[in-house]
Amino acid sequence: QKHNIVVCDSKGVIYKDREPNMAETKAAYAVDDDGKRTLDDVIDGADIFLGCSGPKVLTQEMVKKMARAPMILALANPEPEILPPLAKAVREDAIICTGRSDYPNQVNNVLCFPFIFRGALDVGATAINEEMKLAAVHAIAELAHAEQSEVVASAYGDQDLSFGPDYIIPKPFDPRLIVKIAPALSLIHISEP
């Protein structure tokens, strides 16, 4: 629910009538002013942290205050908002994603862009709509739950590639991505009026 989402920028919580660094594009995300001004103020009990900012924004103390089994998407590159080992040291139940390939759950646009475009090209689509994006998301989710092929398993050595906290998203070089995502988009495009 939108009222459960709090957006922060380099100046803190984006709240209504905030003056410093309040661009018009941020105003749509402004929450009522309840006196909470920092990420540390609003992270208490949070289920999800989605960071696309810079290194060391999320501290271990903040992670401790999050809800049970929090999802932490620390996506800044090359150094995320918090490194997975630091988060796991204080919250073993955390599900952590980064943009880095040297940690589990790498979130990278390489998982979808090539295959979304392939699907669009296959049907002559001139635009990528929300339904096509959702079809890609559902195809990726299906793959994350599917049993791994020998090709994928051999490419990633002894890593456990069964769905769980350290594997919620397919690996970028999973050859099944193209055969799942592109056709899923094609079906959506064809079924639309």
Where are these regions (language model features)?
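Structural motif
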Residues: 4-6, 47-50, 70-73, 93-96, ...
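Short glycine/threonine-rich loop-to-helix capping motif typified by GTGT followed
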Residues: 1, 63-64, 163, 175
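Adenosine-phosphate binding glycine-rich loop
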Residues: 76-182
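A general structural motif
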Residues: 30-34, 53-54, 100-104
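Short acidic, glycine/serine/threonine-rich loops at helix termini
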Residues: 1, 16-21, 61-63, 83-88, ...
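Residue-level detector of conserved catalytic or cofactor/ligand-binding positions
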Residues: 186-193
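Glycine-rich phosphate/diphosphate-binding loop of Rossmann-like nucleotide-binding domains
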Residues: 1-46, 50
